[in-house]
């Protein structure tokens, strides 16, 4: 992969347009980062069908909240990815569906077995298509889990919950 330190980023372009422009290669892209000084470096990582651009930057350390007596518990599962309950008065338990993840995996396994059977006839084990299929599956799963975790955090913030218990407790 290619690494560009903060000295190779055009400060003028960043201040005017909030875009990161890498000198020497003509790559320019929009960013949500507002402070130029916080940017450490930019990495360009080649993938199968695309390139991934990572902007490494510093953020302020978030101080942990003081425990206010409000807690939530999450039970992780397969059909129900997460079941959330809390001791907050009026809190309605929330279930985050896990079936879409099962569906993504089922579709992936079905397609992969089809392609593998075709490849075995040719004497090869992998192809560009199977790698692309695997990338697509990984991206879909990461997207769903990220959206689910973001939803959980917003529920916790909305109900002013400062402590979260996940999984099996030894005392239970």
PLM features per residue range, with description:
Residues 1-47:
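Acidic carboxylate diad motif detector
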């Amino acid at each position: 992969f290619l690494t560009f330190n903060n000295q190779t980023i055009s400060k003028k372009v960043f201040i005017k347009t909030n875009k990161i422009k890498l000198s020497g290669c003509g790559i320019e892209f929009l960013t949500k980062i507002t402070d130029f000084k916080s940017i450490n470096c930019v990495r360009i990582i080649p993938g199968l069908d695309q390139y991934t651009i990572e902007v490494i930057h510093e953020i302020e350390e978030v101080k942990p909240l003081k425990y206010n007596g409000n807690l939530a518990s999450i039970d992780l599962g397969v059909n129900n990815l997460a079941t959330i309950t809390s001791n907050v008065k009026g809190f309605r338990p929330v279930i985050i569906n896990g079936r879409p993840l099962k569906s993504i995996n089922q579709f992936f396994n079905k397609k992969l077995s089809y392609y593998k059977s075709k490849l075995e006839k040719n004497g090869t084990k992998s192809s560009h298509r199977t790698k692309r299929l695997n990338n697509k599956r990984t991206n879909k799963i990461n997207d769903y889990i990220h959206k689910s975790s973001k939803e959980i955090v917003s529920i916790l913030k909305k109900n002013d919950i400062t402590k979260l218990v996940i999984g099996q407790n030894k005392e239970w």
